[in-house]
Structure formats: C-alpha cells, structure tokens
A protein has these predicted regions:
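Acidic/His- and Gly-rich active-site-bordering loop/insert found
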Residues: 1-101, 308
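Structural motif corresponding to alpha-helix initiation and N-cap regions
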Residues: 50-52, 139, 293-294
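Metal-dependent amide/peptide-bond hydrolase catalytic core
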Residues: 15, 160, 167, 173-351
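Short, conserved micro-motifs enriched in small and acidic residues
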Residues: 95-110, 135-136, 193-196, 323-326, ...
C-alpha cells in the first residue's frame, strides 16, 4: 500500500528547485533506520555543493537502484485529496492526489519507497533508493552523485511515463540569444534597427526550417523563454535577449547545433549545452514508449543499464492541475518490484 500520510507530508513541503533542503531534512529523519516498520540498512546524506543534498538509502550492496528527484518546478501548489466524484477527502480515501510534485516527482518517491518496503520485507538485500536535488534546472544532484564513483548494474529512474518503460528520450539543446538593434524614434523606423524585428525575422527562419525527423524519436520541438526587451513603446528596441530550448531527435541533434551557431548579423549565440538523444532498456512483457522529456539519466554515469518509468503522465506535469491517480501509484509500486525481480533474474532483453 502507498503510505498516504507520507505522501501528504512531502507534498506539504515546498521543494521548488533550490529549496530541496527542507524535504531532504524531513525524509532523512522520516526514513532513517529504526523509524519505519521496515528499516533500511543505511542512509547517507550527500552534499551537492550548492546548499542542497542527495539522499541514498541502501539495503546491502545495491545491484538495482531506484532513483528520482526531490525538487519541483515553481510555483508551489499545496496538495489536495479528492474522491472519484471530485469531493475533498482525507488522504487515505483519495482516488486522485493533486498538487505540485504529485506526479513529478514526489509520487515517484512514495511509489519507490513502497516498493523498497515490499522488497525489504521479502528479505531482499541488494537494492537502494537514490533521491536527487536540482533535476529541474540542470541535474546538479545527479552530476554531484556521479562524482562519488558509485556504480551498480541497474538504475530505475522514476518519471511520469504512465507506468510504461521509456524506450528512448529526446535530447536537449539550449542557446542564449542576443539581438543588437539601434534605438530610434518609432515614428522614423527607417533610421534605426529594431531588435524585436531581428528576433521576429529569426523566428520566421526557424519556423520555416526543414528539420530532419526520425522514426524512433519523431519531430524536434523548441520553446522560447526568458524573453526580454525593455524599450518604451515609442523607441525602437536596441536589444533583445532570450533563450531557446530544443528537444532534439537523433537525426536533428547535430543539425540544430550547426544551424544555431552559424554567424548572423546583429545576433550573438551562446550555446548552453544539453544532452544527446538516448535509448533506454526495455524488458519483454512490459509496456514501453518513447518520451520527449529529459531526466537525470544521462548524468548518472556509474550504472550499466538504465530504465525510466513511473506513475502519472507528463501531460499534467509542470501544470497548475498536476495530479496523479492513487491506483497508478499502487500499480507503479508493484511494477518496480517486478522490474527488480526481472533484472536480478537476468531477464534483460535489450538496450
């Protein structure tokens, strides 16, 4: 069973990226050996270096590590628990749980913890649970953990995949853009250069671009954020800054990097890096599908085989109506136990 009270408690803590310490402090105390009915053999608190920390719970020497992240995107949204008819109810009676992190990724935490308790109760002693900070803004916790040198054969990362194994995930590419115009009275635009118009021209070129596609990953997509141009309405904009974020396919990953960094008049491009598209382990007998989001997986380099799966859907993650069905959490708990047994039974099918 999912620990509904634990779920309520962690959802009630604001762990927006940068504020994870409150949640990690709580979990370190709540999940410590001797506190829960099924003890973990060891709990380590690992500093990330930015004021946050990772938590690593282990039973023996882990061959399989369950992993997800403690941070959430803003804004913080307190939890609510509802019956199937939409009425409010106590946590233990809930059909659906709403609030920030309910599926991304605090729902993953409680589902994985439930699986760990089941495995420990069965006497298993070769698994662990890794809770990371900073996933939403750069995988800082994952990068810090990789530096510890820890290694294990299998990693199961919890993300909202509708309890399907992610067969592949798109890559990411991020660029900062600066457009340089020349300020002038807006009544005489022919004597100046509008940075806004330069940006619009660039966006028209991007929208018209024929970006390569591939069968496994589909289309490359992009989004513009951090858009700034502070000119008054009666002055041509002298500058505009923004960031553009691509979700790339294998066919388009190198193409996007080359196209974005071509020299252009009055435009500066600063690459911010990203992750390459990747394929992940799937197992026979388990549902699988590709996903279009990133995760900590590329940065956790000490693991031989990586699986991404978990309860909830990415279609509500990061939204104000983020939610997860309790039945999906229960299903995920059972799924994680089955995956553990399949992996330790050497039933790995392909990567």
């Amino acid at each position: 069973m999912i620990d509904s009270e634990l779920f309520k408690e962690i959802l009630s803590i604001d762990s927006t990226t940068g504020k994870e310490r409150a949640l990690s402090d709580f979990l370190a105390e709540r999940l410590a050996p001797g506190v829960m009915p099924v003890n973990c053999g060891k709990l380590r608190r690992l500093e990330v270096g930015d004021g946050t920390e990772n938590l690593f719970l282990s039973w023996g020497r882990p061959e399989v590590v369950f992993c997800t992240h403690m941070d959430t995107v803003p804004p913080y949204i307190p939890p609510s628990f509802v019956r199937e008819d939409g009425s409010q109810c106590p946590p233990e009676e809930a059909f659906e749980v709403c609030g920030r992190g309910s599926c991304d990724a605090k729902g993953q935490i409680v589902a994985m913890w439930s699986a760990c308790r089941k495995l420990a109760a069965e006497g298993c002693c070769n698994f662990g649970m890794l809770l990371l900070s900073g996933e939403e803004t750069g995988s800082w916790g994952a990068k810090a953990f990789a530096k510890t040198g820890f290694s294990a054969p299998f990693l199961i990362i919890g993300e909202p995949t509708e309890n399907k194994m992610a067969s592949a995930s798109k890559g990411t590419k991020s660029f900062d853009l600066h457009f340089s115009g020349e300020a002038f009275h807006s009544g005489y635009p022919e004597y100046g250069v509008s940075a806004v118009e330069l940006f619009v021209d660039f966006m028209e070129d991007l929208r018209a671009l024929e970006i390569p596609e591939d069968e496994a990953f589909g289309k490359t997509t992009w989004n513009v954020g951090l858009l700034r141009s502070d000119n008054p309405q009666n002055i041509l904009s002298p500058s505009l800054d923004c960031r553009i974020y691509f979700r790339t396919t294998k066919a388009a990953d190198a193409f996007i990097s080359e196209w974005m960094t071509r020299p252009r008049e009055r435009m500066q491009v600063t690459p911010r890096g990203g992750d390459a598209p990747a394929r992940y382990v799937t197992l026979d007998g388990f549902d699988s599908a590709p996903v279009s989001f990133g995760s900590d997986a590329p940065h956790l380099t000490g693991f031989g085989h990586k699986i991404i799966c978990g309860p909830g859907t990415i279609r509500v993650a990061h939204r104000p109506d983020e939610s997860v069905l309790v039945a999906d959490l229960e299903k995920a708990s059972d799924l994680y136990v089955k995956l553990y047994k399949a992996l330790t039974g050497n039933n790995l099918s392909h990567q």
